[in-house]
Amino acid sequence: SCLVGSEMCIRDRLYPKPDDVPSIKADPMLKVAEMEALVTGYIALNTQHRYLSDVRVRQALDMAFDRQTHIEQLFGRGNALLAVNPYPPTVMGYNRDNRNPPRDLDKARALLREAGVPEGTELTLFTRNGGGPTNPNPRLSAEMLQSDLAKIGIKLNIRVMEWAEMLRRAKNGEHDLVSTGWAGDNGDPDNFLTPLLSCEAARNGENYARWCNKTFQALITEARQVIDPQQREALYIRALAVYDADRPWITMAHPKMFTAMRRNVEGYTISPLTNNNFATTLVK
């Protein structure tokens, strides 16, 4: 790596494993810039499958999920934000009234009983075989969720597979749950909501929750057609309230993005988008 050589080097968009950032920061020859990335890791719940079509069941699974422990084990303390909405707080229309439910195993079990879900019901989670920006350790993540759901009487079967196979099978709706994520490339809410949660994407896209909510769809369709930023923002806030009430995902994390560089580099500004701007970058 050029980071350990003598030349000027910038390693852009470093999504570290939990132990990477402290070691880079501790190196006297290096420095690290960081910012919130346009990234969300989440678990999509197949709303067209038995049991998961019931919002009470989706709420129960969400209540059983130990988010704080999950992201600290996966990303390390301070390297990711707890996700609430489908996109991070830096994106327009972030609904700050939305909340993840507090972890409550008793209430989760009660919701499952109310929905008629038998003790010991089996669900299958698809996850990838290698880590990435949205989840550095998919197997550990799956095992932690498996342990969480066992506490409310759900047996989670884990299916680990290649990324391409996982996406193909998830598009076919073969999963109950799928652990995945999304990296936005322009900072607009539509760049998250239409590909991941629209009715069209439920039919033939990347809406792995296979969730089609007419109220939500009408709001994001209108927001795409509105020019005024304040009106757009209000529409997205309303759309996210619908999303929050219906719980098609278990949101996990918004990982931070890190850029490592040698200490002789000055003036470089990290960007959450795909472009690099070296106009103000100097080597001293």
PLM regions: where:
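Short, small-residue-biased leader/transition segments that mark boundaries at the very start
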Residues: 2-10
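Structural transition elements
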Residues: 81-114, 132-140
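Ligand-binding clamshell of periplasmic/extracellular solute-binding protein-like
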Residues: 13-18, 35-39, 178-192
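Soluble non-cytosolic domains of exported or imported proteins
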Residues: 14-15, 51-56, 64-65, 99-106, ...
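Ligand/substrate-recognition segments at binding pockets and active sites
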Residues: 16, 91, 113-186, 229, ...
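Periplasmic-binding protein-like
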Residues: 17-26, 48, 52-91, 137, ...
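Short, solvent-exposed loop/beta-turn-alpha elements that line the ligand-binding surface or hinge
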Residues: 22-37, 44-55, 89-107, 117, ...
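Solvent-exposed, polar/charged alpha-helical surfaces in well-ordered, non-transmembrane soluble domains
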Residues: 7, 22, 43, 55, ...
